[in-house]
Amino acid sequence: VGQIAKIKGCRAVGVAGGPEKCAYVVNELGFDACIDHRADDFEAQLATACPDGIDIYFENVAGRVLEAVIPLFNFWARMPVCGLIAQYSMTDLPTGTNKLPALMRAVLTYRLHIEGFIVRDFADMQADFRRDMGQWVRDGQVKYKEHRVAGLENAPATLMGLLKGENFGKVVIEVSDDPTG
């Protein structure tokens, strides 16, 4: 998403888990900055990286990252919600302070636009997306990294590793030999 934002002329700040991943996001993917969400001073680093606030936040994580983003929203900011990975492995509701009132206050104060983002809602745009994305990948404007794991039997452990941030790239489970190469 950040690479597309850069193509469209936006400033892009990424969030990743660890210095190696952050370096990749900046040096290989071309983001303007990337903040390690595991850093003790993550919130301060994010605020420094976004001195003019945040206009669009593509939500995939929730948890600490979302909490750090909320006070940085600009008026009329947009937040498409595509995932909440920090909550996927939760078996109970979080304890402690309820963060919903802070989010609702931000929605009101900053006139935020929050909308669920489900890919099938944009099926009518699929041909355009495939054309554009294919060209961007061929031109090297969009890059990707795969974290390949052989064998379907390794899928459960790989999923648990994904939830812990142990992967580096898009997880691909190889269930048979690659016929292309």
Q: Model-predicted segments: where are they?
A:
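Terminal helix/beta-alpha structural elements that buttress the NAD(P)+-binding lobe
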Residues: 1-181
